[in-house]
């Protein structure tokens, strides 16, 4: 699927950048983090930040996958509303910015734009971000993606569908 292709392209970019701090915003299920856990062989330890999606099997699925790898994964789940999670992410990034960010979901166009703005604030220079194809395909989300491009487009190089590298 195009979503799987996007994840594969993002994994290649993460490997090239040898990323060690990854953030997923708008966590819907374990598919993105699972793809990271399966592919990640470029670092001894990787920090994964995500939003708690309330799914009890989420942790066990990731733990099972992680057992088959030599990488030490530190999964940090942020709990709360989109605003609370954004605030927590901004605080975490004050110490050290993120290398890679994946926006997996958003409840509205406004929420997506605000997630993009948080990404811009917490992503390091040369860092990569992606907006899930599943999000981009929703009619309502086009406006947010367009607004993001208008505001920050000059700061990013688009290197694939929904894949951006911060300059």
Predicted regions and their residues:
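Mobile, glycine- and charge-enriched loop segments
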Residues: 1-5
């Amino acid at each position: 699927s195009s979503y799987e292709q996007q994840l594969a392209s993002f994994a290649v970019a993460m490997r090239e950048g040898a990323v060690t701090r990854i953030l997923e915003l708008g966590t819907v299920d374990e598919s993105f983090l699972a793809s990271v856990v399966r592919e990640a062989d470029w670092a001894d330890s990787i920090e994964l930040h995500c939003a708690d999606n309330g799914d009890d099997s989420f942790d066990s699925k990731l733990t099972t996958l992680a057992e088959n790898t030599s990488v030490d994964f530190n999964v940090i789940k942020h709990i709360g509303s989109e605003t609370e999670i954004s605030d927590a992410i901004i605080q975490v990034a004050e110490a050290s910015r993120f290398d890679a960010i994946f926006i997996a979901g958003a409840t509205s166009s406004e929420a997506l734009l605000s997630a993009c703005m948080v990404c811009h604030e917490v992503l390091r220079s040369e860092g990569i971000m992606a907006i899930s194809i599943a999000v981009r395909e929703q009619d309502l989300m086009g406006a947010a993606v367009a607004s993001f491009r208008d505001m920050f487009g000059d700061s990013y190089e688009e290197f694939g569908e929904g894949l951006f590298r911060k300059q």
